[in-house]
């Protein structure tokens, strides 16, 4: 379940990739714990993911499109009752209706991609925690793990955003390699990992092997060493990219005339606790 709490400070796939793109953005989210306001995109993603999790909690024969749309409506009503202010994300009723229709279409599209009545997942929204041989703590909330009769594992991650072009597919697979490493440390290397893009009905498949995941583990170690150096010197550099246009903490970035807050010592200590402890910390 997504509401399961990690047992210790650890790196996630999204935050690790975030550091590689922009150390300052990573710092503000992980060290300072700056919370960004919800957006239409994050609201849609959260609601759709919860719906698919609830779908697989049903008996196999009940997992049909009609009932899935009812689950979606229930999940949305629960979200709205808990926080009516989410309606402020929409400019008017027409804007909300367009958003709501996109959400419905993603659930319908899911049934064109997979038959949930033919599947019996090993887990949904599972919190997986592990420590690498280098002593780096990792975690991931994995949308779905399937297990074949022969024991082979398949990792599924639902995506409500746009499918990447071939040029950017390797970056999208960072998360799948991260999850493959997690499972290799806790269960066994998955036979297959898939990113399921609900809007376009595209599926990006990656079949990991031990050599690839070993190289990825080494990449994580190098990234961790860079994080650690930044933490010890108390400086995480901003890095300009086209993604700056969508950055939720840009007002705190010096590249955009923002003021970066003083770095909290407690946050640095929490970050350093994600890796092996050394005498120079």
Listing of model-derived features with the role each one plays in the protein:
Residues 122, 126-222:
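Mg2+/Mn2+-dependent nuclease catalytic core
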Residues 18-26, 47, 65-87, 189-198:
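Short, compositionally biased low-complexity segments
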Residues 51-124:
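A non-catalytic, helix-rich entry segment at domain boundaries
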Residues 32-41, 57-63, 166, 233-236:
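Short, polar/flexible loop-turn hinges at active-site or ligand-entry regions and domain interfaces
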Residues 1-42, 272-281:
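C-terminal, charged and often intrinsically disordered regions of DNA end-processing helicases
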Residues 10, 150, 182-281:
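Metal-dependent nuclease catalytic regions and adjoining charged, substrate-binding loops involved
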Residues 40, 44, 99, 103, ...:
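Hydrophobic (often cysteine-bearing) scaffold residues that line and stabilize catalytic clefts
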